Amino acid sequence: MINSSVQQIISFANVAKKKDKYKILTIPTHERYETQLSKTGHDFYSLNIDQHKKWNTSQCPIPDNYHILPPNDLCSYLNYDFILSQSKFGQFQVLQQINQSLRIPFISLEHTLPLYGLQPAENINVMQSMIGNVNVFISEFSQSSWNIGVDSHVIHHGIDTK
C-alpha cells in the first residue's frame, strides 16, 4: 500500500523525467512513516540542520537508502529530483529557501493539523499559503482543516503488515 502511495505522490509532482530511483531531499519528521517511504527503493537525503529534529534511532533504525547528510551541509552535488517537506511548522520554510537555488519540484506533505485556538490566526493564514507544486494530506479531515485554497491530494497513511 505504501509503495503505491509514494508512486501517487511522484506522479503528482510531474517530475520532468521518469526514473526508477529518485533522489529526494527532506528533513527527519516521522521515523515510522519515513521508514515505510524508504521501502519504495528511492534514495532519501535528510538534512541535518541545527535546531531541527534529528532521526530518533530508538524509534526505528535508519533505512539503508535513507541518508543523513553531514551537519549543515546541503550536498547539492547530489542533484536531487525533488524536495519533500513534511511540516509547515518550520520545515517548509527551510526547504522553500533551499529550493530558491535548487529550483526543483516541491512536494508539501502535511501530517499535522493547524492549531486553531492555540496559534494566532495570522500564523495559520501564513501556513495556509505554504503550498508546493504538489500538496498532500494524510486524511480528508486534514485537507479540509488546512483549507489551502489550491488543488491538493489525500494519501492515507499505510500500515506495513510484513
What are these model-predicted stretches?
Residues 23, 43, 105, 134, ...:
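Residues at the starts of beta-strands that form the adenosine-phosphate
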Residues 6, 87-88, 161-162:
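A broadly tuned "polar low-complexity/structure-edge" signature
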Residues 16-18, 100, 146:
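A generic structural signal for short, solvent-exposed coil/turn residues
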Residues 115, 131-162:
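Donor nucleotide-sugar binding/catalytic pocket of nucleotide-sugar-dependent glycosyltransferases
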Residues 30-33, 45-132, 140-144:
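Extended catalytic core of nucleotide-activated donor transferases of GT-like folds
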Residues 42, 111, 157:
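Histidine-centered active-site/metal-ligand motif
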Residues 1-55:
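N-terminal subdomain of nucleotide-sugar transferases
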